[in-house]
Design a protein with these regions (language model features):
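Mature N-terminal, pre-catalytic/accessory segment of carbohydrate-active enzymes
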Residues: 1-47, 52, 355
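Conserved, mostly hydrophobic/aromatic
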Residues: 21, 140, 156, 228, ...
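Substrate-binding cleft and catalytic face of glycoside hydrolase catalytic domains
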Residues: 49-240, 270, 281-287, 347, ...
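Glycoside hydrolase catalytic-domain groove-lining segments
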Residues: 236-241, 398-435
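Extracellular and organelle-lumenal recognition/adhesion modules and their flexible linkers in secreted
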Residues: 238-407, 595
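Aromatic/acidic polysaccharide-binding cleft in carbohydrate-active enzymes
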Residues: 428-534
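Carbohydrate-binding surface patches
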Residues: 529-570, 575, 611-617
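C-terminal beta-strand-rich structural cap/linker in extracellular carbohydrate-active enzymes
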Residues: 592-621
Length: 621
């Protein structure tokens, strides 16, 4: 029995805008391979968004109105007309739209990134290019909101992950390029008397856990932004309990390129012994397609990294025999295997000790101990080599370790929130779990709802799941480990409709939060849980109460929620998601009420299934 608690006396957020999602307005757009939704499919997809009462849809948007052949703007061309239909469907469904006015900074302004040639670009003239971009931002308000009445467009997202190198920079830092473009857009809107028609959101920093650019933006762009935002993803699965020793952490990796390391000093011409405890599991046996796990002492070139500085692969060994490539099929997936190597440091006075996860198929690796010792000496040179102080002292990249992912989501969002100017809203503008790219897996619903509950509890004004549906990017044929399959970005809770009308299990979990937790004006009250069992409470402007409980583990759990303030005998309708009994079908209906808890006062007791999500609400179906 778990004891949960909700502080329903003082809200952590008094104006929650809802659990939204990235949902691009691609439905019906032309495609060079004919992968185009029919009108019926366009309607089905939009109706699903409306049925779940999706609060915010953030969409890709570019200079589709530009006619490159005539060098003129045509706001009624084929693509814009199709996009208007999507916007109208969103408006009819009560969905607020956030337009990404520019995706790549500065590449969309100076034509130096994957979106190609931009109509804003004046070769060699950043200032004029930037102004042309800003004029387009303002014209978008005139054409879409004022002239055509799409008043559900309420937010402009100022680029995507602009801290990255998304283009060739005009002798400026990524931060400066983004800030100058955002300032230009703000000033153009002010100039045209349109600033009150739209909110500017940024910087959309990601995928980082530190929100360093958000911190910078709060100090350098606060006069331009209405909503602050940043994000990250859960790259690593929660560590199974069988790997964990009480009082210590285990670091895990599941994406090729994941690694952790630290720089240490060496004595020249000294014999060393390096060892690592590893557990790993993969889905393939052929070493040529599986890849390897690299461990050892790598050259210190000033980067504090075990990844090569050029291309892909491990860095250079610091000495002969100082690194090893490990076939993951040769070590156990059930317990840790110790891998040891010996080397002489030669002329080296330092090295980078660490592990590089280069498993190319689906798989994982876990580590609970790294040691580097002089031969005959029992002192571990690696700082915090047993992870008793979590990962302090280690540089990590797509490598982490947690038993309860809720704690990570909460910490990541709090990190961003601490930098947001007082009284200003913060949106966690992308999230999902990426350690398993197949979103049909039974635990995905609980995993994303676990994140949503954490983001609500820490005080975010809104959050955006990447993405609500799988989506075919027009004229795109990308295949990569970021879930693109021939341009079909498979990140959603339902496949593209020309693959299947049947959604994933996670659709039925997420739609409960989306439908029964209201938007604008909703109050969020923080819940307190433990052992991967968490809760939160929302109260709508009209007084409707919704309590959410998520069990993000593989065991059934019983619980009692204690409310700090008596609920005064309300009746709560239960909506019960159990991935073991939920059967997805083409109807994609929201899970209805299966039980009513009558006269709820200061406690509520129930049982929740493994990876289950339960919503208790005063709302009627």
């Amino acid at each position: 029995m778990q004891n949960l608690r909700i502080n329903n006396i003082k809200p952590v957020q008094e104006d929650f805008r809802g659990n939204g999602a990235i949902y691009h307005g691609y439905a019906g757009m032309p495609d060079d391979a004919g992968r185009v939704y029919t009108e019926e499919q366009c309607i089905i997809e939009a109706e699903r968004a409306a049925r779940m009462k999706l609060k915010i849809a953030r969409t890709f948007y570019k200079w589709w109105a530009w006619d490159e052949k005539t060098n003129t703007w045509d706001w009624d061309n084929e693509i814009m007309t199709i996009f208007y239909k999507w916007l109208q469907r969103m408006k009819d469904g009560g969905v607020t739209v956030a337009l990404n006015t520019g995706w790549c900074s500065p590449g969309d302004i100076n034509s130096t990134w994957w979106n190609g040639k931009s109509p804003f670009t004046v070769e060699g003239d950043w200032e004029q290019s930037k102004q042309n971009y800003a004029n387009w931002v303002s014209e978008t308000v005139k054409q879409l909101i004022i002239k055509r009445g799409f008043t559900n467009i309420k937010i402009f997202v100022m680029f995507t992950e602009p801290q990255r190198y998304s283009g060739i920079f005009p002798e400026k830092t990524p931060y400066e390029c983004w800030c100058e473009a955002t300032a230009a857009a703000h000033n153009a809107l002010v100039r045209d008397g349109l600033r009150d028609k739209i909110k500017l959101m940024g910087p959309n920093e990601g995928s980082t856990v530190t929100s360093e650019m958000l911190h910078w933006a709060a100090e350098n762009a606060k006069e331009y932004l209405d909503i602050y935002s940043s994000h990250t993803y859960q790259f690593v699965a929660p560590t199974p309990k069988k790997y964990v020793t009480p009082g210590k952490y285990v670091i895990g990796m599941s994406i090729a390129g994941g690694r952790f390391c630290q720089t240490v000093n060496l004595k020249p011409n000294t014999n060393y012994v390096a060892s690592v405890n590893l557990a790993a599991g993969v889905t393939e046996e052929n070493p040529e397609t599986v890849g390897s796990i690299y461990f050892g002492a790598f050259v210190d070139d000033g980067r504090n990294d075990v990844h090569t500085a050029n291309g892909h692969g491990p860095s250079i060994p610091v000495a002969e025999g100082s690194t090893v490539a490990i076939d993951p099929n040769t070590i156990s997936s059930d317990e840790f295997t110790k891998v040891t190597l010996k080397f002489n440091s030669g002329d080296a006075t330092s090295c980078v000790i660490g592990v590089f996860h280069d498993i190319k198929c689906a798989g994982f690796s876990y580590c609970n101990l790294v040691e580097l010792k002089e031969e005959g000496n029992d002192t571990n040179i690696a700082v915090n080599g047993d992870f008793s102080d979590k990962f302090n002292g280690w540089r990590t990249f797509v490598a982490d370790g947690t038993i309860d992912a809720y704690d990570d989501w909460y910490t990541w969002a709090k990190t961003g929130l601490q930098y947001v100017p007082e009284g200003m809203p913060y949106c966690f503008d992308e999230y999902n779990v990426t350690f398993n790219r197949d979103n049909s897996h039974p635990s995905h619903g609980a995993e994303i709802c676990n994140a949503a509950v954490a983001l609500m509890n820490c005080g975010c004004q809104s959050s955006l799941l990447w993405t609500i549906f799988d989506q075919q990017w027009p004229n795109n044929h990308t295949y990569n480990n970021d879930s693109f399959v021939d341009g079909d970005h498979r990140c959603g809770v339902a496949p593209v409709l020309n693959r299947s009308l049947v959604p994933h299990l996670s659709y039925y979990a997420f739609t409960l939060l989306s439908r029964y937790i209201d938007g604008e004006g909703t109050k969020i009250y923080e819940g307190f849980g433990n052992d991967c069992l968490h809760t939160s409470m929302a109260v709508s402007p009209n007084g409707e109460i919704t309590v959410t409980v998520v069990n993000c583990k593989e065991e059934v759990d019983e619980f009692t929620i204690s409310f700090d303030k008596d609920l005064e005998g309300v009746n709560l309708n239960r909506h019960y998601f159990d991935p073991a009994i939920c059967v997805p079908d083409e109807k994609a209906e929201i899970i209805g009420t299966d039980k009513v808890f009558e006269n709820v006062t200061d406690t509520l007791s129930d049982k929740i299934p493994a990876y289950g999500v339960i919503v208790y609400t005063t709302m009627k179906d």
